[in-house]
Amino acid sequence: MYICNCSYTSKLKAVFFFGLILSLCCACSRAGARRVSSYDHYWVKAADERVEADRKWADYLFNHLDRRTGSRSVALRQKPVQGTFLQIVVHVDAKGKHDYSTVLDGDVLRLTACDEDKMLWLIYQFLASGEDPRIESSDLPPAMIDIAHAEGDFAFEYRGIYSPSNADPELMPVTASHHVDYDWGLWGHNLRRVFPGEVPEEALAWVDGQRDENQFCFSSEQLFKAVEAYVTDNYGETGGVRFAIMPNDNSAVCACKACTAAGNTRKVATPSVSRFIRRLAERYPHHLFFTSSYRTTEVPPAEPLPQNAGVIISAMDLPLRPDFAGKRPAENFSRKVKEWRKVVSRIYVWDYMRNFDDYFTPYPCLGVLSERLRYFYSLGVKGLFYNGSGYDYASFDDLQTAALACMLINPDLPLESYTERYLKRFYPHASDILLPAYLSWERIVKEREALLPFYGGIADAVSAWLDPVEFGAFCDRLDGCAKRTDGMERRRLNELLTALQFTRLELLRMPAGAYDERKADLYLEALYGYTAFSGMKNYREAFGSVQSYLEEWNILKTENRESQNPLKGIRLSCQPAEDENAASLPVLTDGLYALPSDYHTGWFIASSRRFVLQVPPGKISDGAVLELSLLYAPAWHIFLPASVEVWQGEGKMASFGLPPVGEKEVFSKQRVSCKLETVNPDIPVELRFMQVAAARASVACDEIKVY
């Protein structure tokens, strides 16, 4: 039984003494038991040959044992006539006390599960247990239970992981995990899919006196009939499929007469959306329908919804760091969950397991995720969706996905032990290098109570856990080991090492770091090997082409090589001094440029409506040309300034001519310059910036140069 081993539940104290006695008794009863591997044969038997499910799964276990032992008559469906044997009794019991149990009693091992899905998982726990070397299990993640004696309930009914290591539909049942691309009829903001052609006008929201093609009217009968046809035609009436019914991802709310009468306001669409979901839930009582606590549907409905309705709540505002419980974000999240529990029977949480700006730098998140899962369980959350890197490679994703699949069954999984068993199974030669490194990163995150950002740069990793010198030594040791391995381990290591070159390149780009073009060339050459791996085209969620990154780096090397700047090392000042990024002023004169695709590293970013950068007296001569390197990235609210003027004292000296930029441009670097004819060497030179009139506008500059 999963009992949360933390302060979130009062069950622990009540069962502690009983559990201690029980475990001691079990230990005594097993002390004389034989190991599974000590038997000549396995006699696989259905608990009741008259029950179809028992026969089916006994046959399944027999067939897979026969295949994985090489058909050496190790597995039998009839009682062996000679030799020692372990009888394995398979039983599907919907009325059992727990979701699963395994009991080794003498020479009989009983495998019991409450349904067929869990029986399949339990069979693979036996096959992956590693008890018998005759059973080939090198392709299976290590078992998470003691196959001789285990019983328990799955902590969560839905266990979704959106990661490349969970993308094989044949492996998902083995790990008892889910994937939104396979087990949801509708997921996310994809309601548009119910219309095979154009969305009819009557199904569109009425916003500011006209139809809005970017939002739906949830009082529309045409919308309801389209969803009804989609559900019936694709999934029937009895399947128990999950559907997410969400408005499009914007702030528009339908204000037609019907939606307004339902209770919609200018910012809240909950009344019309919840009424729509109620109709669907009543129409299809065997399917599950979910709304989202997000943007226009963040607040719960006033009245409870049917039992087959639920809500998906994002954990984006819950920082991914240790010891988060009891702090304000957790209190706010708990309050939201409790409010929704009053009106729905199912609460699923959309949580996150990656830095979406950097998939390649290791992200030691397992300890924090374990803590979060115990917290979610204590709140009565019934399902989790973990947003990972989708189908794109992420460093250590194989280990983390396997461990997370186990933690979604039991959040109290002993992480260090499981990590050790996983790495020794899949990296037998390199585990002595990988294991201490990975566990040390997890421990550092815990000790520092470090924040693991959902969107962050290399400086965030260094702040949280990464020691640049030790990391470089780790990569070198791992590279040496990889050259002595072969087969699948060699391929896995090559893929990991290729990704880690990205991290080494990012460390070279850090302000006040150790930029070295010779090392950059070595790391770039290794990163070009990404083409050998189908999942390594992108290093981040959006605009993350590895090929584009490599091309930007080649430009960057040229920029840095040509950066002969009299201002190099000169400290500028900024007004207002309280600007949130004043500490990054040194990047403006460090002689190192930044990448336009990454605003995290190497950029001075200012969001004040007006701000002034001041160059000390005597640093700019008559006739000098002053050059600014600016970032234009409107998707990140970074724009070219409306104006930049150069002043000394009360006199304006010059203005920078700012180029037009394409509205559809994602990001680009723009260099602008102006000539200063006469400069007073006794007075500072001021660069006065004015922001454009845009919401949350910022200006970013990576270098100020004089020539």
Model features per residue range: what roles?
Residues Q222-L223, E331-A430:
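Structured mid-domain segments that build the active-site/substrate or prosthetic-cofactor binding neighborhood
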Residues R35-K45, E52, W57-Y60, H64, ...:
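Feature activates predominantly on carbohydrate-active enzymes
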Residues L408-P586:
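Catalytic domains of carbohydrate-active enzymes that cleave complex glycans
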Residues S73-H98:
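Short, well-ordered secondary-structure micro-motifs within conserved domains or adaptor modules
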Residues H637-G651:
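Short, surface-exposed beta-strand/strand-loop-strand elements in extracellular ectodomains
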Residues R688-R696:
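Short beta-strand-plus-loop segments that form exposed binding edges in beta-rich domains
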Residues I555-G623, S629-L640, P659-S668, R696-Y707:
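Disordered, acidic Ser/Thr/Pro-rich linker "stalks" and the adjacent N-terminal cap
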Residues M653-E677:
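Extracellular carbohydrate recognition and processing domains
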